[in-house]
Swiss-Prot record:
GO cellular component terms attached to this protein's record: sulfurtransferase complex
Membrane-traversing stretches: none
Functional summary from the UniProt entry: Part of a sulfur-relay system required for 2-thiolation of 5-methylaminomethyl-2-thiouridine (mnm(5)s(2)U) at tRNA wobble positions.
Coiled-coil ranges (or none): none
Main localization, broad class: cytoplasm
Pfam families in UniProt: DsrH
Protein name as it appears in the record: Protein TusB
Record keywords: Cytoplasm, tRNA processing
Protein family: Belongs to the DsrH/TusB family.
Compartment(s) of residence: Cytoplasm
GO process terms (BP): tRNA wobble position uridine thiolation
Encoding gene, per UniProt annotation: tusB
SUPFAM superfamilies: DsrEFH-like
Length: 95
C-alpha cells in the first residue's frame, strides 16, 4: 500500500499512521507533510523506525525552502517517480 502524508505531521495522527504501515508499503510525504522529513527531528526518526521506504516530493520541499534541512534518509522524488509508486502500489491511503 502507498501511504501519503500531505498535512503537517503536527496535525496528523502519526501514531495511527505508523501502526498502519506494513512490510511492502511505502510512505510519500507531500505538501506540508514534507515537514516530517526534517533532519534531526523527532518525527523523522519515528518514520525511519517503521522500516518502510520513505519518500519526499522534491517540488514541495523546494517550494518550502527546506532542501538543505531534509534528512538524507528520505528519498527526494519528482512527479514521475510519484506516479511510478502509484503504479507499484495500486492501493493508497491518504493521511
Amino acid at each position: 500500500m502507498l501511504h501519503t502524508l500531505s498535512c503537517s505531521p503536527y496535525h496528523a495522527d502519526l501514531d495511527t499512521l505508523l501502526r498502519g504501515l506494513d512490510k511492502g508499503d511505502a510512505l510519500v510525504l507531500l505538501q506540508d507533510g514534507v515537514i516530517a522529513a526534517l533532519a534531526g527531528g523527532n518525527i523523522i526518526h519515528r518514520l525511519l523506525d517503521s522500516a518502510v521506504p520513505l519518500y519526499a516530493l522534491r517540488p514541495d520541499v523546494v517550494a518550502r525552502g527546506m532542501t538543505e534541512q531534509i534528512s538524507n534518509s528520505a528519498v527526494l522524488i519528482g512527479y514521475n517517480e510519484f506516479v511510478q509508486l502509484t503504479v507499484e502500489h495500486p492501493q493508497q491511503l491518504a493521511w
